[in-house]
Amino acid sequence: MTKDEVIEKVKSLNLPKDSYIVFGSSPFAVLGIREVNDIDLLVSQELYEKLKKKGWQKIDKGPKDKPLVYDVFEAHTNWDFSTYNPTLSELLSRDIEVEDISFASLEDVRKWKKASGRPKDLVDLKLIDDYLASQHNG
């Protein structure tokens, strides 16, 4: 998905401000770094319960990872997948706002990708570093 597609999809959910942040790799699309296949959300417990009542399906991806899924979305109540596990309020305090949608900062995405260390994360770390270098030089 491109920047416009991510923004359109998130806006279509009509979620209450400050009850979620777009995390995972989705900030890449908004910054024009690369397209993404899905949209990860870190949501408040209250919003999680509302989404569950709306029919979002709970899946089990591991001991601490039981997101709700709908269409291209995964809604998580925690980001406890690596040694970097920020809270919703921490991420919101450093967010990037695009068209009134809160996206995790590139610095937060970088910390998570570095802590995760999967092969795809290492590729993304290089993309982040190249993007940041181009911003400082441009």
Q: Locations of the language-model features?
A:
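Compositionally biased terminal segments of proteins
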Residues: M1-G138
